[in-house]
């Protein structure tokens, strides 16, 4: 080894010892011919001092991020010069000799200057990600991720799970997003697909009798740009045989409990549950943030006989902003712009004066009886503001759910370090294909119905015989775990019977021929004694970003893509050469296709 000790591990007990350290020059300070350098390695920082005239003279040439090997004697710092912010702050190393292992070019941004961290653009940080990761905060994010991996593995290993790798080159199967395709050179005109999840393989492993599988899996989805999404991401993927929903939830809670212990937080279990229907009714979201107590009040029946045209709609709902009546007009106008940015025409409101009198444009257009009763109906008090949404139920609730979150931010209702977990259960099995497409998802099949979770989710037992007769009424045997308004995991009990799977495909408009072509291997496997099974997948990037207090999952990924799916470091994606294109067979037709007559 090129060193005897790590910089961040030196203590008073090491005083008098001769040590050799290696690392990077984090800071350099000259004081009357004596040079002080903060030497950084993976463990932290040690102050090394160049007092000897010969070494001090040579040290004048050292610059930020030079790589050094220094040898010297550990000494206690003079009284009053200790640094309580450093683990090694009681000591320093008096250098007797050093070697420059490598020099550094001028830096594109300062690594150690915490005050300028927010001034460096993300594109620059990602382009020089290897420098960005020298910052302790960024490096510690990856270490936290490693610790989370270890904690999860420890839990799963204790329950006799087997870690199994599944293919990353597979066939294209419809799973809810577009596939990344890889040309197969040895079979021109055909393509592999990178997996959107290990879903089908982990189910096949249950058919194989493995019973308890897990994997920290890389997944790939060619989605349109969405904030804080990555085209490649990581799941902690878990599947179990001979289980029901309660078994999977209990295991998931054990994993989450151990992972959150890494930051000193004890999750209270069992984690509360809410039905999907109640989540949408009360919070306007299937991933509600329950750190604050603001609920949506339904007002459709209250305004059933209204003369106000805006409220003559399928749905009317409201949320209350405590103290919101004191907002200036410009802030109320800003709320309208906020709503329009979300596709709404605006956000109607009533101001409840300190004397109880109602103000605002809505108050002038509703009946006397409605004016007298609306504050009590929604739970508003003098000084509050009532925001309304009216229209179709789905979009109106979504707008009120977003308003609820915005109110919490404006009123500073969310405390640092506060955690709220909830299971969302009993989601619909199917949704309108038009709604799925409108929300940015890919609707599978050629029916007006598509799966809410995926096509392999079992209906709840009470809907097993009727889900294809009344798809809109069927509930899925599924469960999502939500933390602070973020969906951090989702799972379900799977279909394990071939006839049930074929019925689901039929509801979704997937023909027998397409089902055989895309999923024949799964249907065949179900014919050979597939056990009942279920599982869950955790969004590992999101979980680690929450643990570390990061705003973006990019901070917890070693080499992330930018928001547009571009890697500024390698400049990927990039064009390929004509020779690569020819050899890959991208433009070739599959032999089977060449033998078929062209469609007219």
Swiss-Prot record:
Cellular location(s): Cytoplasm
Gene symbol of the encoding locus: aspS
Annotated source species: Corynebacterium efficiens (strain DSM 44549 / YS-314 / AJ 12310 / JCM 11189 / NBRC 100395)
Description of how the protein assembles with itself and partners: Homodimer.
Biological role: Aspartyl-tRNA synthetase with relaxed tRNA specificity since it is able to aspartylate not only its cognate tRNA(Asp) but also tRNA(Asn). Reaction proceeds in two steps: L-aspartate is first activated by ATP to form Asp-AMP and then transferred to the acceptor end of tRNA(Asp/Asn).
Coiled-coil residue spans: none
Keyword terms, alphabetized: Aminoacyl-tRNA synthetase, ATP-binding, Cytoplasm, Ligase, Nucleotide-binding, Protein biosynthesis
One of the GO BP terms on file: aspartyl-tRNA aminoacylation
Keyword Protein biosynthesis annotated: yes
PROSITE patterns linked: AA_TRNA_LIGASE_II (PS50862)
Its EC number(s): 6.1.1.23
Biased segments, Basic and acidic residues type: 580-600
Record-given protein name: Aspartate--tRNA(Asp/Asn) ligase
Sites marked Important for tRNA non-discrimination: 31, 80
The keyword Cytoplasm appears for this protein: yes
Main location, first listed in the record: cytoplasm
Annotated binding of L-aspartate, by residue: 175, 221, 453, 494
Pfam families: GAD (PF02938), tRNA-synt_2 (PF00152), tRNA_anti-codon (PF01336)
Molecular functions per Gene Ontology: aspartate-tRNA ligase activity; aspartate-tRNA(Asn) ligase activity; ATP binding; nucleic acid binding
Region (Aspartate): 199-202
